[in-house]
Amino acid sequence: MSAQRAERKEIVQRGLWFEEYEVGTAYLHRPGRTMTEADNVLFTTLTMNTQPLHLDAHWSSQQPGFGGKRLVNSMWTLSTVVGLSVSQLTLGTIVANLGFTEVSFPKPMFHGDTLYAETKCVSKRVSASRPGQGIVQLEHIGRNQNGDVVCRAVRATLVQCDPAASGDGSLDDGAA
């Protein structure tokens, strides 16, 4: 049996190397994540965000515009959208999160809504100052179960190049 094990091919789960990102490609992250009341209250209290629209059911029931429901914390929504992308894109291959731009929340999330995420590779370039690494710009989109966009953010990441690649910069696609 050990001889069979030695001969089998093994693949370790990981994100994408810099070279594997395709500019313009949309990566769909499944399954989605149903947002629960417990998730929202825990995240909201852990981050010291005491807004009653997240925590106070009675107060929220008296506010116009949301049907008396409490809103899911938008930072939880953003964190979950990024989190849903990790196993497919950046697991073990990201060096650093360089920053977010263009963050928006066009529609609210409520307890019981399911969040689905997708990520588009906007651009990529080999790092001029960090050999063996590249900068990948990603656009994350979160949608609820009805397909409504509830979160959008553009993120710059520093990603490892494939250790087996040449590393001479010839993989730069010129975008960015």
Describe each model-derived feature in a short phrase.
Residues 1-23, 105, 109-114, 118-176:
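HotDog/MaoC-like acyl-thioester-processing domains
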